[in-house]
């Protein structure tokens, strides 16, 4: 048997140690952000996906180069479409 000493009990519940307080706050914030991410992930990632797809600004670029860039982007999209399975719902 190992003798028990007084003062070895866990004091996590009533601890005022700054490290414990900071860890608790970070844990709670992480949990809140994770829940929000799971609830709104479709909206968030759709906005990020289409918000970043606008491409670079075309100010000062000749129209012929703009058209060439559009064609390159479209051909890249056409190539990528072959990797996906299209499911049509009736």
Curated annotation (Swiss-Prot):
Location in the cell reads: Virion membrane; Host apical cell membrane
Locate the region Disordered: 53-76
Give residues where Phosphoserine occurs. 57
* Control of this protein's activity: The M2 protein from most influenza A strains is inhibited by amantadine and rimantadine, resulting in viral uncoating incapacity. Emergence of amantadine-resistant variants is usually rapid.
**A Pfam short name:** Flu_M2
Q: Which family does it belong to?
A: Belongs to the influenza viruses matrix protein M2 family.
Protein's name in the database: Matrix protein 2
Question: What organism is recorded for this protein?
Answer: Influenza A virus (strain A/Guinea fowl/Hong Kong/38/2002 H5N1 genotype X0)
The top of its lineage is:
Viruses, Riboviria, Orthornavirae, Negarnaviricota, Polyploviricotina
